[in-house]
């Protein structure tokens, strides 16, 4: 961007440099001397004010010029409106017309509305509101936000300033090429074709979710899973009566809420598994609430009906209490009794799923570029970044250029749920896609774009936007934030780095761990990613005083050596709950100990003896409990505590004793207290630490 020096502009305007500098300072454009430079916008503004002025007498010309430069920015803007609208005519007509324009603007401004983007500079806000930027800067500084005229502020702060000036504020919705791509155009009814339902199986841990899926798809993964609990989200296709059903398997424990939520966003039908012997459990209630919130139809599979302790009617009663009344009881909830182990009722369950799918009238357009959702992503040896994708509309084909979040790629290969290579995948089909530039995030929307070059450009732009948003948020500094950060010096932090084999595990661990935070200890996951533990992870942990948690991954050799050198703690796990329990234990070490008072006993002072060199000793009778030699005590007189301290000596007759039980007499010497009187009550107690 070219810049103009003050003396060059003065020469062009036929003014002296001194006069121009004076007038620029009046406009809050700070220049030091004739060699100072001006931005193009500033030059344009000044030229706009002085160019094409009607030729008049020197006196009138000078007066007009002075008036212009004495106006504030609002007047300048009004002058520009006036000049643009009324360039011709006599000076008298111009003045009259200007008044008319200003009156009209004033009437329109009674309800002033401005549109503000997510971020804008102080200068841009001033231009929108037609006020002096200096005034805005003053108001922001008063709120503790230090900014310059070209520094960006966020929508929230900009809106507050605008409201102070009487403006109604709307947020600008900027639609770039990315958002336009994400906005799916509605399909014509004639292009839509029936598609298979996508079914998610949910339920309480150990209620037989995986076993039910095994029975449905005739596979056996239960024994391969660590701890008998599904660790990763899988997808499979089942065919019945020449119709297909797609099953998603979301883990059923509370720790995997994030993974479950992701599964339900693309789900058409939910099968809720409830054990006939256990009934409704906490995770069952959680799953029901999630399904209700997602407004997805639900079928209840009452599993383990082959067990002697099975009680399906009790399950139905408990479900009814939660608003899921079975059809046979006059409600709308389909309940199917099944036994995954004995293969009972499986066909009936599948028929019910197809029936509900038919009622839902599930359709999609296969004859268009594909759109879908990443349900799982990982880095696989020999394959590189691999993602499981559910195609939701259109058809995904080999060679398609794809975009998912900030990751781009080209479909090099596709595998179906049986591991077979396929060339295309239609609506509802789950496929494993190879060809991504990096590991995408689970939950990202996948879209097909015209070519790989375009996909790369869009992915890079998304990355830039993310960095820009992060940078802008970092630039927001207020006195309030600064004060709270100083105050938080007393809050202890436990920093954690998570590395796992799949993205879903990273998310689940992150949420579970961060939920353990409390008022005294804040747990902060500073990094989470897929892949082995590297030297970079160890260096980050060393710099941040963090613990590294590896889930189903191992540290590289160099990383292990570096961790020993840097004294970085690496914990490796194969079951998620063990990781959470260990973190809880680590937290206890950071918590300030809490104590509670435990009363040991009460003794009444019945005589006071003066012992030379020792002081007063209380002759006492133990009313309740026991008095210990090392216990804390308080002396109570007429219901008022007169002293708190410790026992200096405890004797029975002339012997020192460790404790005196209820009903016995003893002599108690109190540390640094001689004002003991007959009738005083001595309460003995000790402080016990409360387990955290």
Curated annotation (Swiss-Prot):
Region G2, residue ranges: 228-232
Locations listed in the record: Cytoplasm
Classification via Pfam families: EF-G_D2 (PF22042), GTP_EFTU (PF00009), IF-2 (PF11987), IF2_N (PF04760)
Protein name as catalogued: Translation initiation factor IF-2
Keywords: Cytoplasm, GTP-binding, Initiation factor, Nucleotide-binding, Protein biosynthesis
Organism name: Thermoanaerobacter sp. (strain X514)
Gene Ontology MF term list: GTP binding; GTPase activity; translation initiation factor activity
Ranges for region G5: 339-341
Region (G4): 303-306
Annotated function: One of the essential components for the initiation of protein synthesis. Protects formylmethionyl-tRNA from spontaneous hydrolysis and promotes its binding to the 30S ribosomal subunits. Also involved in the hydrolysis of GTP during the formation of the 70S ribosomal complex.
GO cellular component, one term: cytosol
Keyword Endoplasmic reticulum listed: no
Stretches for region G1: 203-210
Domain tr-type G residue range list: 194-363
CDD domains documented for this protein: IF2_eIF5B, IF2_mtIF2_II, mtIF2_IVc
UniProt-annotated binding residues for GTP: 203-210, 249-253, 303-306
Matching InterPro entries: EF-G-like_DII (IPR053905), IF2_II (IPR044145), IF2_N (IPR006847), P-loop_NTPase (IPR027417), Small_GTP-bd (IPR005225), T_Tr_GTP-bd_dom (IPR000795), TF_IF2_bacterial-like (IPR000178), TIF_IF2 (IPR015760)
Annotated Gene3D superfamilies: 1.10.10.2480, P-loop containing nucleotide triphosphate hydrolases, Translation factors, Translation initiation factor IF- 2, domain 3
Signal peptide start and end residues: none
Spans annotated as G3: 249-252
Alphabetical list of PANTHER family matching this protein: TR-TYPE G DOMAIN-CONTAINING PROTEIN, TRANSLATION INITIATION FACTOR IF-2-RELATED
Sequence similarity: Belongs to the TRAFAC class translation factor GTPase superfamily. Classic translation factor GTPase family. IF-2 subfamily.
């Amino acid at each position: 961007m070219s810049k103009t020096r003050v003396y060059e502009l003065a020469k062009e305007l036929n003014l002296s440099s001194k006069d121009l500098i004076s007038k620029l300072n009046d406009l809050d454009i700070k220049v030091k001397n004739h060699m100072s430079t001006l931005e193009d916008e500033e030059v344009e503004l000044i030229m706009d004010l002085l160019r094409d002025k009607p030729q008049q007498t020197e006196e009138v010309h000078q007066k007009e010029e002075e008036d212009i430069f004495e106006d504030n920015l609002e007047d300048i803007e009004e002058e520009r409106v006036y000049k643009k609208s009324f360039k011709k005519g006599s000076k008298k007509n111009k003045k009259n017309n200007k008044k008319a324009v200003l009156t009209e603007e004033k009437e329109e401004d009674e309800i002033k509305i401005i549109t503000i983007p997510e971020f804008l500079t102080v200068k841009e806000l001033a231009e929108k509101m037609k006020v002096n930027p200096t005034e805005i800067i003053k108001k922001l500084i008063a709120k503790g936000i230090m900014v310059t005229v070209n520094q960006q502020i966020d929508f929230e702060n900009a809106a507050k300033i605008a409201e102070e000036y009487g403006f109604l504020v709307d947020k600008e919705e900027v639609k770039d090429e990315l958002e336009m791509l994400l906005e799916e155009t509605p399909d014509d009814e004639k292009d839509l074709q029936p598609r298979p339902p996508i079914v998610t199986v949910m339920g309480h841990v150990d209620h037989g979710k995986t076993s039910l899926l095994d029975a449905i798809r005739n596979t056996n993964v239960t024994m391969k899973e660590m701890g008998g609990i599904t660790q990763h989200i899988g997808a499979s296709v089942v065919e019945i009566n020449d119709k297909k059903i797609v099953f998603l398997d979301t883990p059923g424990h509370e720790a995997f809420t994030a993974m479950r939520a992701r599964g339900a966003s693309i789900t058409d039908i939910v099968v809720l598994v409830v054990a006939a012997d256990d009934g409704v459990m906490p995770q069952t209630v959680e799953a029901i609430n999630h399904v209700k919130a997602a407004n997805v139809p639900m079928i209840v599979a009452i599993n383990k009906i082959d067990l002697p302790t099975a009680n399906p009617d009790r399950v139905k009663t408990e479900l009814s209490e939660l608003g899921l009344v079975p059809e046979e009881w006059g409600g709308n909830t389909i309940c199917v009794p099944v036994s995954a182990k004995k293969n009972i009722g499986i066909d009936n369950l599948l028929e019910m799923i197809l029936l509900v799918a038919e009622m839902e009238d599930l359709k999609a357009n296969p004859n268009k570029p594909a759109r879908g959702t990443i349900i799982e992503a990982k880095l696989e040896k020999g394959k590189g970044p691999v993602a499981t994708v559910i195609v939701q509309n259109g058809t995904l084909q080999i060679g398609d250029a794809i975009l998912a979040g900030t990751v781009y790629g080209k479909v090099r290969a596709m595998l179906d749920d049986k591991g077979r290579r396929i060339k295309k995948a239609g609506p509802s089909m789950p496929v494993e896609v190879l060809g991504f530039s990096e590991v995408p995030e689970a939950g990202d929307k996948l879209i097909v774009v015209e070519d790989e070059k375009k996909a790369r450009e869009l992915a890079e732009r998304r990355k830039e936007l993310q960095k820009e948003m992060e940078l802008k948020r970092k630039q927001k500094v207020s006195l309030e934030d600064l004060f709270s950060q100083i105050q938080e010096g007393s809050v202890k932090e436990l920093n954690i780095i998570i590395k796992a084999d799949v993205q879903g595990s990273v998310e689940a661990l992150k949420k579970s761990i961060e939920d353990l935070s409390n008022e005294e200890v804040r747990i902060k996951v500073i990094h989470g990613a897929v892949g082995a533990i590297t030297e970079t992870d160890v260096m980050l942990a060393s710099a941040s005083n963090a613990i590294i948690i590896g889930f189903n991954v191992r540290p590289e050799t160099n990383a292990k050596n570096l961790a020993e050198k840097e004294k970085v703690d690496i914990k490796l796990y194969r079951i998620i709950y063990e990781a959470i329990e260990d973190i809880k234990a680590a937290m206890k070490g950071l918590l300030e100990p809490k104590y509670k008072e435990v009363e040991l006993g009460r003794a009444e002072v019945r005589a006071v003896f003066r012992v030379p060199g020792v002081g007063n000793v209380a002759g006492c009778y133990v009313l309740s409990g026991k008095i210990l030699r090392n216990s804390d005590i308080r002396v109570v007189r007429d219901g008022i505590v007169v002293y708190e301290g410790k026992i200096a000596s405890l004797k029975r007759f002339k012997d020192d004793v460790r404790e005196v039980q209820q009903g016995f007499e003893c002599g108690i010497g109190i540390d640094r207290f001689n004002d003991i009187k007959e009738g005083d009550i001595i309460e003995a107690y000790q402080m016990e630490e409360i387990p955290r």
